[in-house]
Swiss-Prot record:
It comes from the Bacteria. The gene is purC. Pfam families: SAICAR_synt (PF01259). GO terms for biological process: 'de novo' IMP biosynthetic process; cobalamin biosynthetic process. Gene3D superfamilies: ATP-grasp fold, B domain, Phosphorylase Kinase, domain 1. InterPro entries: SAICAR_synt/ADE2_N, SAICAR_synt_PurC, SAICAR_synth, SAICAR_synthetase, SAICAR_synthetase_CS. It catalyses: 5-amino-1-(5-phospho-D-ribosyl)imidazole-4-carboxylate + L-aspartate + ATP = (2S)-2-[5-amino-1-(5-phospho-beta-D-ribosyl)imidazole-4-carboxamido]succinate + ADP + phosphate + 2 H(+). One of its GO terms (molecular function) is ATP binding. NCBIfam families: purC. It comes from Pediococcus pentosaceus (strain ATCC 25745 / CCUG 21536 / LMG 10740 / 183-1w). Keywords: ATP-binding, Ligase, Nucleotide-binding, Purine biosynthesis. Belongs to the SAICAR synthetase family. Pathway: Purine metabolism; IMP biosynthesis via de novo pathway; 5-amino-1-(5-phospho-D-ribosyl)imidazole-4-carboxamide from 5-amino-1-(5-phospho-D-ribosyl)imidazole-4-carboxylate: step 1/2. This is Phosphoribosylaminoimidazole-succinocarboxamide synthase.
Length: 242
């Protein structure tokens, strides 16, 4: 397996073609962004931490039957994925109030929901990723009704698996963002990444933030926090596999 030409460089990853046409080589970068990329910082070690966390979580999801683009971990900051066409929607699942939801509806921080809230956002940095409902997504031919139902069902299944996995690491999954893509045979699969860049995590007891919010709000050291998440996931691996 060889890495060949660069496909694109995003906010946190570089994607490369390989000598196998259906596979893509993903390299995680030492870059942190906020405000849809308007703020950028180089943070040494971040790429390796995100990749390792992502691989642990995707391996868990695959083991539980979730269809994904993940193939294998290549190194501490690289992995191999199936090539997919990304659906331009960010699917957000919320288990408790935080972030924009908390501000918009003026509710208490970490107020728990009786059932998870699933939201779609149109994936566009230029438009600041606006909220979009199912009818609008269908009107814009981003997805059809059956696909919207499939995305919501998969997102809720992923949420349940992640909640249980993080709980074993003494972490509460407050909310998270995922993206989906279509394979060459039109199968919808989970794609992109799951890491503290895309999840809100707090300690189960102290409610201390252990995610990218420490970078957004400048309240802590991102590498220290991400290393703590990785350590907790690694330390709870034996229990998961036991």
């Amino acid at each position: 397996m060889k890495k060949t030409t660069l496909i694109k460089e995003g906010k946190a990853k570089r994607l490369y073609n390989t000598d196998e046409k259906d596979l893509v080589w993903v390299e995680y970068m030492d870059q942190a962004t906020a405000l849809n990329g308007k703020r950028k910082d180089h943070i040494a070690g971040k790429g390796e931490l995100n990749n390792q966390i992502d691989c642990i979580l995707f391996e868990q999801l695959v083991a539980k039957g979730i269809h994904t683009d993940f193939v294998q971990k290549l190194s501490n900051n690289e992995q191999l994925n199936r090539k997919v066409k990304i659906i331009p929607l960010e699917v957000v699942v919320r288990n408790a109030a935080s972030g924009s939801f908390q501000r918009k509806f003026d509710v208490s921080y970490l107020q728990a929901f009786d059932q998870p809230v699933v939201e779609f956002f149109y994936k566009s940095d230029e438009l600041d990723d606006p909220f979009i409902n199912t009818n609008k997504a269908i009107a814009l031919k981003i997805i059809d009704l059956e696909e919207s139902q499939r995305l919501e069902k998969m997102a809720l299944e992923i949420n349940q698996i992640l909640k249980e996995r993080f709980a074993k690491a003494h972490l509460q999954l407050v909310d998270f963002k995922v993206e989906f893509g279509k394979t060459a045979d039109d199968e919808i699969v989970l794609a992109d990444e799951i890491s503290p860049d895309s999840c809100r995590l707090v300690d189960l007891t102290t409610k201390e933030s252990l995610d990218k919010d420490v970078f957004r709000k400048k309240t802590g050291d991102l590498v220290t926090v991400y290393q703590e998440v990785l350590n907790r996931l690694n330390n709870s691996q034996e229990e998961v596999h036991g």
